[in-house]
């Protein structure tokens, strides 16, 4: 053994590391001291050779004693002591046993989280910590990844730790939502970790969904490292809900013969007798694993132990179980299921079963039922189940309380025990008050209210009870004896009482006998003593004393005997544990005394007289009675008293236990019989053989079963529903149960599955069921594959598989044969297509394929299929399909159940639901296909091939390359009967200068990405490039290679025929080079390259290190110049080259200015001699885009142009620059540049992002961006962002679409002229042969074809509408007409636009004259037009405010604080001059103190916070400019950069994500906008007096430029929580803007605020327009008792740059604000100036919508920085609060440097928002700031005028009652009490009434006046002062009618 330690010996200091113990003892012969864990003590025991003293259990070490080898690994959280010499300690005389505090800490459930934390903290160096942390992360990463994969569900906050304690490794990082995530997590653990490990033998699963069963098989196969042991799935369909849950398949007569069964969440529905019937029905069954969902505490009460997990209630004999508060997930089960927890074994005749509870997870229990009884099995035992940490309070003395009402938390009970004894003066309400602070905690939600009440009463009544413990020194032996006698006084007194009683009873009798007898011998303890002679003569003396005359008269028995023989003896008899002195006697007394073990007396034969006996007993009862009195009156002995005290007050921990006993029953049938004639399993065609099972021990031979009941009885109790999806509890006759066997998959991956068989017929094959595949959510087929489907044939739902299915070809293939015969496509290819579209469950059916499969084939291959079945005619496929044919369906004839599809077959009538699958007759021969039309789409087989050379055509070839096998195969290749668009195979030789130029630039890092890669990634490429550079200097000789160049327009189909060519045998050794990773993925997907073959497709730099005989270069013009030559130089094995590209789409341009690659001839010029034809057609582009370029297209889609703000498609966002692409990608959007998208194809509309860089894009790159989509183009954000040059393709395409739209609306207008690409790109097309028809032939020899006529355009307007957006969006995107310039809208009628900009208003303005207008004669001239043209709108109907009921809260209890005394000491003695600054030779004056009242404290209390007043402080504004304003460098307008647009776009989407709404625009509401204008005019004009407006007439001065603002400072005293006791602060600047902007943009902001208020979700709180009471109510409903996050910012207003302007423009466009308003807003923000200079586009306080824009910007930043989801958030301007600390957005680290705004997150359990501390209890005004205001007002004498406002603020928290203390930090409690004290001192009685809880007393006069039945005090506080006085004095009847309903206009916050 090796130990790491540091010790001191007799010699020098030794610092040892990993020394053997023998070496340690040798170096320290004098002994040493070391602390070690307990498990190491046996190895360090003292020995004779090394007298080591006993070792403590902790290591003493020092951080100063370096170097050390982590000796702190043996300690537990103790600070290191100073380095001192340790001396050997002598061994103690008697080593004391280790106490609990010194023992090593024991951790359960894994290593302790902080066991090595001191070791990590000891590492001061960051590198050392990173080294340690890397190993920790490496160890944690697999476990965390596995846990997130297995348990991806988002769990409530405190449940991950609870599940971890239960052994379930769930984490708090789950992200998937679930109706009951905790139950789902437990179920997942049960299936994949608990059951999957126990299925070691062939097993059958019962009552489980098919998807869960498939996943369970995969988990078991991975664990057992072989084929899965789960072979059968048995799902009886017993209710209608089961039919929806389980697959409906027949069930055999007998159960599967597997030794293991697993019953999933159903045991509670079966009785032990039914389980016995199951074992009898399955004689091979040995073990049954069953899961039981049952709250064990249901046996003791109706309140659950885990209410957040489940709730239940009992009704009769049933238990209703609700999962996690979700009523939809509830179900009912029998209450008798608890017998499974109380049964240890089941006996049913000769059958013996053992029941074992394996594990319990809260309400889920794993039960094992085994056949037989084991030898060591206990018939009766006790089990413990999960329960809270609780104690059971005793019953009261007078009555009994239910057990559930006496269970309380142990921690609370113990804390309350200490609390009631620690309080000096305990009040009656103190225990209840303490409990109130604990009862609202989430961890105690299982405690009933009755239990809390019982605990409070118990603590109050037992508080005076104290233990009778005392401690005596016992300094003398006498004290020890007295103490012993005191402790044993009760048993000693009892013994003496009995002895005295027996002695007193025996004395009279003894005296009577001594008269006639003498004592001759005394025997004591076996020793004989001779008594003195006087005792022997005593009877004689007595006889002499008796007169002789009396002797005759004495009774005979009293007369002395004739002889004096001694008969009396005294003896001791020895008993088992005591010795007793006995006096033998006779008679009844002898029997009685013997039973009492008291001394007995032996007498002579003569009986004593009865009076003497009675006298003796009477004397003996005296001490007995006295002893009994003392026994019952005196206290118990101290030990008994303490034991009773401990039992009463120190209760042990309560555990939920069950006593289990055996159970005897009669077996009953397990399942009901489905019908009188059960269906047997039908034989199907055999499956391919599956891999054999691994060797396993054979199951025990089945016992000979005795006669048992049938498997299917006539009735059964309620079927077993699932807790995850519970069915209704009612029982019903069952449908046919389903046994779903699972075969082996088609392929053989490492985990293979055996092919199961049916038990009833072992040799019969079963229906093939493929292995489970990951599926997408179920959606309509028409949404997954959009198109115009005939007869709604695409409306069925489909779960699209994420990977292709591997289902074998079906036997019932008549539909495939019919479609193959019609189209000429092989039926195997058709089946492969269906495997890519449908999941395996939809491909396997006993009835064959259906019309759903026909629709999928028709969509894929562009068919319109007419299906005839009797009189029914249906069409399947697309209405626009170019090909059509007919199929007939023959319905089944009973008893057959399968129909038949065929071409031109006879018809019979049937229903609309058609299925068919009869084996089709083989259609072969020329007649079968010659008469059928053939489609031109889809893959075609290679054989039979056409002739090598068409007649009349001889290719021009070079001698060697052109006659190679590759050249011949390329010329021979046909796709859809069409050859490749080439004339010949060219010979190409390497151009060494081009290769040398490129390799030199690569080596120097001027081109490519190799130089920017990490060193570890470029180790393989750099040596290769250096070698190529050397090879280019001395090139080896090599012959020319064959080369073909396929060039054509975008989307003409250059790649697809080459991909089919590479699939042939000749071209199997190939590699493909792509310019981008995007194209690489498309090629891999098209070629189906996976695993080892994926190397064949790579990007251009990594391809230089690979070898293949065929080289394919895609998009060659996007690669550096000379790449073809360098590739041939790098790979001498290349024999044939295929290059693809379009010279029109631009060429490569180096980004490094030092690169010399641009000096070479461009590739389009270098490769032009090798272009045989240029294919000027397209298969990709929609007709709108193709017609614009004048290019024919085969795409029937019309296409559209739109301006949209949301990318709802899978296509990426195309941006002009790399920087914007990186910014948007970091924000979570898929973005690539225009040029990088070259070669890609997107089925959805492509989104082209426009900014100022779009003007710099050439037409070559613009062509790339416009030609990517199959369906249309979306520009974003608006048409004004299009390039200004009219010849730019973006602008030209927009103008073409506009003109086309106008022409279709009005045919009299000219049709727009398309762009002629042959003229636009004539430089690139010069000398090329252009083909305009894809159906060309080489017979023409490549002659130039004439231009084809343009295809006719559709005339409907729906062509401009996108068809790929889902229907669940609120509105469609902004289309073309939404962004038309206003000067152009005159020439195009509104009816021609797809959407109206202003919908037709339904308001009747004809009656506008009936409404009074405002007299505008006093309005300034600049305001007259807008004021006079708009008529006022009708007032909206006011919504009644919700009724507010006072909560039943406890009155607030305040500690006694003198507010005035606290005010005297509130301000520390500080020199005010130290708080000022010196600016421009002047001192500031924010803390004036001269001539200020100081009646309260030594200094004026106004010094607690800065005072901003420009009149008293001339330096205020100028000194604040540097912090409050940001200036532009010049007078030029601020330019919106690409970064601003990208960040604004990200912020906009984050804001919409916060509102949980679509970013798409909503229709404009002109009526609402008009009302906003009227409201704004009322606020700016009507509500003001004429004098005020005339005084401010300069604000409407026409000479005042509208972009100029006047900056002034805000006068205020900054008394708030963050400004108290601070020094000089910059003032807040306000901007005075032109009235034009206020009147024009003010209605826009009001309109946006109304729209936002409608969409705002409940978890989002905006403080605008809300009262503090509403804030408090929202907090009570949404906040949780957790740590809150406050995101503070540095210079919030000044840090908002261009991205804020872009965000505001996006918001206005979403609201469909007319474009002039948006343009005006952007113009003002980018051109703003003030008297100090030009300003940046920062936020200026005073501009319209300052608060709303600040709030939205803050909210957008929060949702960009964090993953908030539905977390409650409070936002108000730059103030924000998040309910709990959310996870960081993974993209934020990349986005944070791009923002000028710097967040400063702060976490605290006490959240401060807008001056209020908020929490789950509500909101309370920050007490310190409120106290400062009260104290300042008290000092300057203004308190009477302000106290009403302060009382209103204080009443918000006061209304919460005693719960407000949970919201205030402990250090501020004194200020809250001081505020209460000052208000009580100085407020009027009517104001104090607002501080009372509950309703105002029922004053009849007030209530009759207000027509209310009650009036809450918060509402009373809002009344004006006059009304409050009248109400208070009972004079409300004097108020005018309705006066009291108007709240006070005094500010209250």
From Swiss-Prot:
PTM summary: Specific enzymatic cleavages by the host yield mature proteins.
Q: Where is the Peptidase C21 domain?
A: 762-922
Q: What Gene Ontology terms describe what this protein does at the molecular function level?
A: ATP binding; cysteine-type endopeptidase activity; mRNA methyltransferase activity; RNA binding; RNA helicase activity; RNA-directed RNA polymerase activity
Q: Where does ATP bind?
A: 1048-1055
Q: Where is the (+)RNA virus helicase ATP-binding domain?
A: 1017-1175
Pfam entry (one): Vmethyltransf
The Gene Ontology biological process terms listed for this entry are: DNA-templated transcription; methylation; mRNA modification; proteolysis; RNA processing; symbiont-mediated perturbation of host ubiquitin-like protein modification; viral RNA genome replication
Q: Which UniProt keywords apply?
A: ATP-binding, Host-virus interaction, Hydrolase, Methyltransferase, Modulation of host ubiquitin pathway by viral deubiquitinase, Modulation of host ubiquitin pathway by virus, Multifunctional enzyme, Nucleotide-binding, Nucleotidyltransferase, Protease, RNA-directed RNA polymerase, Thiol protease, Transferase, Viral RNA replication
* Region of interest (Disordered), ranges: 77-103, 674-773, 924-948
Segments forming domain Alphavirus-like MT: 171-341
Q: Where is this site: Cleavage?
A: 909-910, 1342-1343
Task: Show where the RdRp catalytic domain sits.
Answer: 1682-1788
Q: EC number(s) per UniProt?
A: 2.1.1.-, 3.4.22.-, 3.6.4.-, 2.7.7.48
Q: Which residues form the (+)RNA virus helicase C-terminal domain?
A: 1176-1308
Compositionally biased intervals (Pro residues)? 80-98, 685-731, 740-753
Question: Where in the sequence is the active site?
Answer: 814 (for protease activity), 900 (for protease activity)
Q: Which family does it belong to?
A: Belongs to the Tymoviridae non-structural replication polyprotein family.
Record's protein name = Non-structural replication polyprotein
Protein source organism: Grapevine fleck virus (isolate Italy/MT48) (GFkV)
């Amino acid at each position: 053994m090796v130990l790491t330690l540091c010790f001191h010996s007799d010699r020098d200091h030794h610092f040892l590391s990993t020394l053997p113990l023998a070496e340690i003892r040798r170096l320290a012969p004098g002994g040493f001291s070391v602390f070690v864990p307990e498990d190491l003590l046996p190895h360090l025991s003292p020995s004779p050779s090394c007298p080591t003293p006993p070792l403590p259990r902790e290591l003493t070490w020092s951080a100063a004693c370096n170097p050390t080898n982590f000796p702190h690994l043996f300690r537990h959280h103790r600070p290191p002591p100073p380095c001192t010499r340790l001396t050997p300690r002598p061994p103690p005389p008697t080593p004391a046993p280790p106490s609990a505090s010194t023992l090593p800490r024991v951790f359960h459930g894994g290593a302790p989280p902080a066991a090595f934390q001191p070791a990590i903290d000891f590492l001061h160096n960051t590198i050392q910590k990173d080294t340690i942390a890397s190993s920790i992360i490496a160890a944690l990463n697999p476990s965390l990844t596995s846990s997130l994969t297995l348990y991806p569900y988002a769990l409530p906050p405190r449940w991950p730790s609870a599940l971890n304690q239960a052994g379930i490794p769930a984490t708090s990082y789950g992200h998937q939502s679930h109706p009951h995530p905790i139950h789902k997590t437990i179920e997942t653990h049960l299936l994949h970790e608990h059951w999957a490990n126990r299925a070691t033998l062939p097993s059958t699963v019962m009552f489980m969904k098919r998807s869960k069963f498939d996943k369970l098989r995969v988990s078991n196969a991975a664990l057992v490292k072989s084929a899965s042991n789960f072979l059968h799935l048995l799902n009886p369909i017993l209710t209608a809900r089961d039919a929806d849950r389980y697959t409906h398949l027949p069930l055999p007569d007998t159960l599967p013969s597997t030794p293991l069964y697993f019953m999933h969440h159903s045991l509670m529905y079966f009785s032990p007798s039914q389980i016995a019937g199951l074992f009898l029905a399955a004689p091979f069954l040995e073990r049954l694993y069953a899961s039981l969902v049952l709250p064990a505490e249901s046996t003791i009460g109706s309140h659950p132990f885990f209410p957040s997990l489940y709730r239940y209630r009992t009704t009769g004999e049933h238990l209703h179980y609700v999962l996690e508060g979700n009523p939809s997930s509830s179900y009912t089960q029998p209450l008798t299921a608890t017998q499974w927890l109380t049964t240890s074994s089941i006996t049913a005749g000769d059958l013996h079963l053992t029941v074992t509870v394996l594990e319990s997870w809260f309400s889920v229990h794993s039960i094992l039922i085994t056949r037989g009884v084991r030898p060591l099995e206990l018939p009766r035992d006790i089990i413990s189940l999960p329960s809270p940490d609780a104690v059971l309070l005793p019953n009261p003395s007078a009555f009994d309380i239910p057990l559930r009402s006496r269970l309380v938390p142990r921690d609370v009970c113990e804390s309350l025990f200490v609390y009631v004894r620690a309080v000096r003066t305990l009040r009656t309400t103190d225990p209840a008050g303490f409990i109130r602070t604990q009862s609202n905690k989430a961890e105690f939600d299982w405690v009933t209210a009755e239990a809390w009440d019982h605990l409070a009463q118990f603590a109050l009544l037992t508080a005076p009870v104290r233990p009778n413990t005392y401690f005596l020194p016992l300094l003398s032996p006498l004290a020890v004896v007295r103490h012993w006698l005191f402790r044993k006084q009760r048993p000693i007194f009892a013994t003496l009482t009995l002895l005295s009683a027996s002695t007193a009873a025996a004395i009279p009798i003894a005296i009577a006998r001594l008269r006639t007898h003498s004592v001759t011998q005394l025997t004591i303890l076996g020793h004989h003593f001779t008594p003195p002679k006087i005792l022997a003569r005593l009877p004689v003396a007595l006889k002499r004393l008796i007169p002789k005359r009396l002797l005759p008269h004495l009774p005979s028995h009293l007369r002395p005997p004739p002889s004096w023989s001694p008969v009396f003896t005294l003896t001791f008899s020895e008993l088992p544990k005591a010795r007793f002195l006995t006096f033998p006697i006779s008679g009844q007394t002898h029997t009685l005394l013997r039973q009492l073990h008291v001394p007995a007396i032996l007498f002579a034969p003569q009986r004593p007289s009865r009076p003497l006996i009675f006298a003796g007993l009477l004397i003996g009862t005296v001490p007995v009675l006295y002893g009994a009195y003392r026994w019952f009156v005196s206290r118990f002995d101290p030990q008994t008293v303490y034991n009773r005290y401990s039992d009463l007050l120190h209760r042990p921990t309560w555990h939920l236990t069950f006593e289990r006993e055996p159970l005897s029953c009669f077996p009953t049938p397990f399942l009901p019989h489905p019908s009188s004639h059960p269906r047997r399993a039908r034989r199907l065609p055999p499956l391919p053989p599956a891999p054999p099972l691994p060797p396993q021990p054979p199951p025990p031979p089945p016992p000979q079963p005795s006669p048992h009941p049938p498997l299917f009885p006539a009735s059964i109790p309620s079927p077993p529903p699932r807790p995850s999806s519970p069915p209704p509890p009612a029982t019903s006759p069952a449908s046919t149960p389903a046994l779903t066997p699972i075969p082996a998959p088609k392929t053989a991956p490492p985990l293979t599955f055996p092919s199961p068989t049916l038990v009833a017929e072992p040799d019969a094959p079963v229906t093939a069921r493929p292995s489970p595949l990951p599926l997408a959510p179920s959606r309509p087929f028409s949404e997954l594959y959009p198109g115009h489907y005939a007869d709604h044939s695409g409306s069925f739902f489909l779960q699209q598989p994420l990977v292709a299915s591997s289902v074998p070809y079906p036997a019932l293939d008549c539909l495939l044969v019919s479609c193959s015969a019609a189209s000429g496509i092989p039926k195997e290819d058709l089946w492969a297509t269906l495997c890519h579209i449908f999941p395996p469950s939809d491909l396997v059916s006993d009835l064959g394929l259906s019309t759903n499969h026909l629709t999928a084939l028709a969509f894929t291959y562009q068919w319109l299929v007419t299906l005839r079945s009797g009189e029914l005619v249906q069409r399947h496929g697309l209405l626009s399909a170019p090909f059509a044919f007919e199929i007939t369906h023959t319905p089944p004839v009973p008893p057959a159940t399968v129909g038949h599809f065929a071409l031109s077959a006879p018809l019979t009538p049937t229903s609309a639901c058609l299925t068919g699958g009869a084996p089709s007759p083989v259609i072969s021969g020329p007649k079968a296909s010659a008469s059928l039309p053939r489609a031109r789409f889809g893959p075609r087989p290679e054989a039979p091939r056409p002739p090598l050379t068409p007649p009349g055509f001889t290719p021009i070839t070079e001698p060697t390359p052109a006659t190679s096998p590759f050249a011949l195969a390329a010329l021979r290749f046909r796709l859809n009967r069409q050859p490749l668009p080439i004339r010949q195979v060219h010979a190409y030789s390497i151009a060494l200068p081009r290769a040398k130029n490129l390799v030199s630039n690569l080596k120097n890092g001027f081109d490519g990405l190799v130089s920017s890669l990490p060193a570890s990634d470029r180790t393989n490429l750099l040596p290769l490039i250096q070698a190529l550079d050397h090879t280019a200097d001395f090139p080896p000789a090599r012959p020319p290679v064959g080369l073909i160049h396929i060039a054509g327009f975008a989307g003409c189909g250059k790649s697809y025929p080459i991909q089919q060519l590479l699939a042939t045998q000749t071209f199997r050794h190939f590699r493909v080079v792509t310019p981008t990773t995007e194209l690489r993925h498309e090629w891999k997907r098209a070629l189906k390259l996976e695993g080892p073959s994926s190397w064949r497709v790579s990007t251009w730099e990594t391809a230089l290190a690979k070898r293949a005989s065929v080289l394919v270069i895609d998009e060659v013009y996007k690669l550096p110049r000379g790449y073809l030559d360098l590739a041939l130089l790098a790979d001498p094995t290349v024999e044939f080259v295929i290059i693809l590209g379009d010279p029109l789409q631009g060429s490569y341009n180096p980004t490094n200015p030092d690169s010399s690659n641009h000096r070479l001839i461009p590739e389009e010029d270098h490769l032009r001699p090798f272009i045989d034809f240029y294919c000027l057609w397209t298969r990709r582009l929609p007709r709108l885009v193709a017609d614009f370029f004048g290019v024919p297209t085969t795409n029937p889609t019309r296409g559209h142009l739109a301006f949209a703000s949301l990318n709802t498609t899978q296509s990426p966002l195309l941006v002009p620059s790399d920087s914007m692409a990186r910014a948007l990608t970091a924000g979570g959007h898929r973005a690539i540049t225009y040029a990088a998208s070259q070669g890609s194809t997107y089925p959805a509309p492509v989104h082209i992002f426009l900014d100022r860089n779009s003007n710099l894009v050439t037409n070559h790159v613009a062509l790339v961006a416009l030609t990517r989509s199959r369906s249309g183009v979306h520009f974003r954000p608006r048409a004004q962002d299009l390039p200004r040059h009219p010849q730019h393709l973006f602008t030209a395409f927009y103008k073409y679409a506009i003109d086309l739209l106008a022409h279709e609306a009005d045919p009299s207008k000219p049709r727009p002229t398309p762009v002629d690409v042959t003229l636009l790109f004539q430089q690139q097309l010069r000398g090329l042969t252009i083909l305009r028809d894809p159906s060309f032939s080489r017979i023409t020899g490549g002659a130039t074809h004439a231009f084809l006529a343009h295809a006719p355009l559709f005339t409907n307007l729906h062509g401009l509408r996108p068809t790929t957006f889902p229907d669940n969006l609120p509105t469609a995107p902004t289309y073309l007409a939404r962004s038309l310039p206003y000067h152009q809208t005159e020439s195009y009628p509104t009816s021609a636009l797809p959407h109206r900009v202003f919908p037709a208003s339904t308001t009747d303005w004809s009656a506008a004259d009936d409404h009074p207008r405002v007299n505008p004669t006093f309005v300034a001239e600049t305001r007259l037009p807008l004021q006079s043209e708009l008529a006022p709108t009708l007032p909206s109907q006011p919504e009644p405010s919700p009724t507010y009921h006072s909560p039943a809260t406890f009155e607030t209890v305040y500690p006694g604080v003198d507010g005035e005394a606290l005010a005297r000491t509130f301000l520390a003695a500080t020199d005010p001059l130290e708080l000022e600054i010196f600016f421009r030779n002047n001192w500031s004056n924010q803390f004036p103190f001269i001539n200020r009242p100081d009646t309260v404290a030594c200094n004026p209390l106004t010094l607690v916070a800065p005072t901003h007043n420009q009149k008293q402080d001339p330096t205020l504004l100028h000194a604040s400019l540097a912090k409050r304003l940001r200036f532009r460098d010049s007078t030029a307008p601020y330019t919106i950069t690409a970064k601003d647009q990208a960040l604004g776009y990200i912020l906009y989407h984050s804001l919409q994500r916060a509102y949980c709404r679509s970013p798409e625009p909503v229709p404009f509401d002109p009526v609402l906008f008009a009302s906003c204008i009227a409201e704004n005019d009322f606020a700016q004009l009507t509500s003001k007096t004429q004098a005020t407006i005339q005084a401010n007439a300069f604000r409407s001065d026409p000479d005042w430029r509208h972009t100029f603002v006047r900056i002034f400072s805000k006068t205020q005293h900054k008394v708030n929580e963050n400004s108290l006791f601070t020094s000089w602060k910059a003032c807040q600047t306000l901007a005075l803007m032109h009235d034009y902007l206020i009147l024009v943009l003010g209605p826009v902001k009001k309109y946006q605020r109304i729209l936002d208020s409608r969409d705002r979700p409940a978890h989002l709180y905006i403080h605008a327009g809300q009262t503090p009471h509403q804030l408090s109510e929202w907090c009570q409903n949404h906040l949780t008792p957790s740590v809150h996050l406050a995101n503070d910012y540095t210079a919030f207003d000044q840090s908002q740059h261009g991205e804020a302007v872009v965000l505001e423009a996006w918001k206005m466009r979403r609201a469909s604000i007319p474009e002039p308003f948006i343009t005006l807003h952007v113009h003002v923000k980018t051109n703003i100036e003030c008297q100090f200079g030009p300003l940046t586009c920062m936020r200026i306080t005073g501009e319209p919508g300052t608060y709303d824009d600040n709030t939205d910007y803050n909210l957008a930043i929060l949702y960009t920085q964090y993953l908030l989801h539905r977390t409650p958030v409070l936002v108000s301007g730059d103030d924000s609060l998040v309910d709990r600390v959310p996870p960081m957005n993974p993209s934020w680290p990349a986005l944070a440097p791009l923002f000028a705004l710097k967040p400063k997150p702060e976490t605290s359990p006490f959240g401060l928002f807008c001056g209020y501390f908020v929490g789950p209890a509500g909101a309370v005004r920050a007490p310190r700031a409120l106290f400062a205001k009260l104290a300042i007002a008290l000092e300057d004498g203004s308190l009477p005028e302000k106290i009403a406002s302060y009382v209103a603020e204080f009443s918000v928290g006061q209304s919460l009652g005693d719960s407000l203390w949970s919201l205030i930090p402990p250090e501020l409690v004194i200020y809250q009490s001081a505020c209460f004290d000052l208000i009580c001192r100085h407020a009027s009685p009517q104001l104090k009434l607002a501080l009372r809880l509950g309703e105002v007393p029922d004053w009849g006069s007030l209530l009759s006046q207000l027509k209310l039945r009650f009036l809450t005090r918060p509402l009373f506080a809002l009344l004006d002062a006059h009304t409050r006085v009248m109400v208070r004095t009972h004079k409300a009847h004097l108020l005018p009618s309705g006066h009291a309903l108007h709240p006070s206009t005094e500010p209250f916050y």
